[in-house]
């Protein structure tokens, strides 16, 4: 959708979402009025859902509090980056990824995360409206960095695969 109002005659495209008709990530090429999808990642594997899980865990409302998590990121330290990489998400060199669903309940439960997630990050989710701690700031910084790294890998792979200079 970002391609059509763009000034480009041709461009690669990348779409990321929590879940949109089961596709969470797709990329491909757009020329004129034709789109060709080259790769898709499907639910439950989703960077948006990963980010929403951390939004929930930090005590914010899913689908409306993600901006708060992003706003906390600059105040944190990246002390959970390795934990996220080692346990929650497997990112390939091409930027494709899979979440370890052993830590998440959003696919079938009423919570975004589960007790195993709580154990990984030293306790239960922050209760909404309770004071923020350094833990939430560090979680925000860590998931922000992991998300950005994954998207940059995707972008590099898309550029290498398509040779296109423009990305929508």
What are the language-model segments listed below?
Residues 1-168:
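Short acidic/glycine-rich loops and adjacent helix/strand connectors
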